[in-house]
Amino acid sequence: MCGIFGGVGVNVEDARRCLDNIRRGDDGITVKQFDDVVIGARRHLVKTSDKPGVVLGESDQPYGSDDGKVQMVLNGELYTFKEIRDSLAGRGHTFTSTGDTEVFLRLYEEEGKNFVKNEMIDSLFAIAILDQRSNELIITRDWPGRIPLFYYYDPANRVFLFSSELKGIREVNWVPLDDVVELTPGDIATLDLETFELNIQPYFRPTPVKTENGIMEIGAKLNDLLKISAHNRTMGDVPICVMFSGGIDSLLTSFYVLNSIDFSSVDYKPTGYVFAVEGFESEDVRRAKVAADGFKDIGFELKEIRSPRSTMVEDIPDVVATFETRKIKALSVYPLPIYYYLAPEMRKDGFKVTIGGHGVDELLGAYDAWKELTASHKVQTNVKSRLKFMANIYENMLRRASIIFMNRGPIEARFPFLQPDVCEYMLGIDARWLNISADNAETLARLMEDRGGPQDSWTDQMCDIHGYLTRYLDGGGEHPEDADEETRYEMEKLFWKLPMIVAGMKASQESFLPVDVLFNAKLRGQHGAGITDLETDIVNRFANLGNSDGEIFQNVVNQAFRLKSA
């Protein structure tokens, strides 16, 4: 993971100043100029490249073809670089380094702009390529947008700039930041350097993989896909930690990743982080501690990070500005402090990569209604709604994970659930498997009985869930009459992620994962961490910026990025 910047209309000094402001790594900056095109990178080293001639304190990018006619910079990681490298070597390509950027470069030389469609690629990336043979400057980014990539295009003045972050282009003070565009994930943009025409084409959009299989087969397949995705995301030469809030998303992500690492051969121990407001009785922390106990056999350490309310309120303007979302919603802001405060602690402990369970709520339509999000669960589980969630995930969840973690660490974030094969499979899961019903309740109750071990060893939570399911089934698939609304809702939410529970059941048969931790249900993170309780304090403290939290956040962004509405 790095920061990239370049284009036409700036010089080397401008580009270096812009890269200085991106803050996506502290392992060196290099900028080079080729005629009127400038291209540069800021390095966050997670895997050594052994590239000859790299000067200490500089990035190893850009990478050039043997004749120097093609130059590439990469922000990201190519998890399957070894397999692709071997394939290219078999086709006659030679390599001067052991890193993944050169593999992308050789793949481009072999396949041209279609290289992004290569099915062997498992990667998060934003890439810029200067091809002097075709006289083109090309930029592209992964789907669903795990790496940000912005551009500014002014053909009348022959200006085209690209940047990993809006803060980079902000350093070019004559650029109107309202006119900077974020490249859509799964698109590739080609600038003809002779005509200065810009052509943008999609190269990938997800196609849900529909299946007629039952929930047991679905869970088994999901388990297989997640094992592969998680294993790939352990690539690198640096310590890896996990985000661990205690819910099933972070629980399974942590399991699949940590189960892929041989801790006897590395010099760090399995570590997870959970955040909450200081003094808040956090459901996140309580659930995380319960879940962490299920990982004790591998020596797992859970670190609880807290921050005072007053500090968090004072930091909100910087938190919002770091997020650099120009049309911001209050819904998007309250999760941000988790990343803002975790990143420095992770880095202080020696980590450079973290793993998160991001994407599950979007893939399965499993959001609680809150703030601007009001769609019912039935609407959310519609495939069209889930595709729409995924189309927009880069503007919110992925931006905060990538930009805030990198700016505050730098920490690179990786997401096993957002591997395209995993996404397409989960998007294809029929909505009938995402709701409570008599059939689903019977399946889950039977699984608990068959795989949960002796019932006298079950946790109270697991006993309560099984007891509720028994009463639900005895009532003909209806909630017990004496169950209050909150209990009914929590039981319904359990089934929103039934495929995950079944996948976890399969994983528990193959590993150390205890079945009971799969039933550690909880509310979503920012609520359980106590951050939403800060709303009144924020509105009172920054009343000069607006009458509501949403208005305050928008005005902070307007001022930070010279927006016309400021």
Put a short name on every predicted segment.
Residues 1-310, 318-322:
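Cysteine-centered catalytic environments shared across enzyme families
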Residues 40, 494, 519-521:
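Short alpha-helical segments used as structural interaction elements across diverse proteins
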Residues 202-203, 438, 514-524:
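Conserved S-adenosyl-L-methionine
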